[in-house]
Amino acid sequence: MTVAPEGRKLLRLEVRNAETPIERKPPWIRVRARMGPEYTELKSLVRREGLHTVCEEAGCPNIFECWEDREATFLIGGDQCTRRCDFCQIDTGKPAELDRDEPRRVADSVRTMGLRYATVTGVARDDLPDGGAWLYAETVRAIKELNPSTGVELLIPDFNGRPDRLAEVFGSRPEVLAHNVETVPRIFKRIRPAFTYRRSLDVLTAAREAGLVTKSNLILGLGETPDEVRTALADLRGAGCDIITITQYLRPSARHHPVERWVKPEEFVEFARHAEELGFSGVLAGPLVRSSYRAGRLYRQTARARA
């Protein structure tokens, strides 16, 4: 394999990754499909209206639970990211022109689906003068204007730590501002070369100082040690992070980083306990947890704790 699906030549790192075959999943990585009435209704509505959600397009294992709670996730900014993280399935390349009508369409989708809580995430847009800050902020504003009773969670890139860009995004006042650190300092540069660990922590601190509920995520199985996970959790809490999700890395393709280890369910229980002891007000940890999993429930739990 020398060419990526999007047509570009593979990076040397991707060629090296591809030398390791896709790993066999352990028995505890299994999804049970429970299709309740809310899920069934949303599924038919999405198909009928031609709507697009990350939940379906990324094959999220938690779609049955989230849609039953009337929660869904949307991807904005296109399908090409200007950065490349070694765990992420989104393609790296030159994005299409900015679609200024996208916020309205997302807001319409939220209304059509009757969502109680919507998560919005997107690609990095370093090609734009503002790094995409307007697009992220305007999407929140559009959702809130059309759906005043719907909670909004916004998962952002770091916008290179630029205060003006962060201020634009924070000013849209999502219920939760999320920025995912994803991994520990020792391997951070290898896994997320276009980001820095310190800057990611600073983004969370700035959001907390702006009065927002903050959230982050750690992916396990990328080569970190348990002690490093505990240290990263302490760093995140010290930076002002309110909510943490802890997940198992599942390799999207052979050109992505190999799975270094399968973290056992009991280890996730221990990490969750440690996070709670550190003072996180919302914690979810498990092999199939994803950063937007039960997002509305975690927000409400955190809001009660801060009241």
Curated annotation (Swiss-Prot):
Give cofactor(s), names only.
[4Fe-4S] cluster
Q: Which residues are recorded as binding [4Fe-4S] cluster 1?
A: C55, C60, C66, S292
- SUPFAM superfamilies (UniProt xref): Radical SAM enzymes
Give the originating organism. Mycolicibacterium paratuberculosis (strain ATCC BAA-968 / K-10)
Mind telling me what this protein is named? Lipoyl synthase
Where it sits in the cell: the answer is:
Cytoplasm
Name the UniProt key words of this record, in alphabetical order: 4Fe-4S, Cytoplasm, Iron, Iron-sulfur, Metal-binding, S-adenosyl-L-methionine, Transferase
Q: What is its main location?
A: cytoplasm
Molecular function per GO: 4 iron, 4 sulfur cluster binding; lipoate synthase activity; metal ion binding
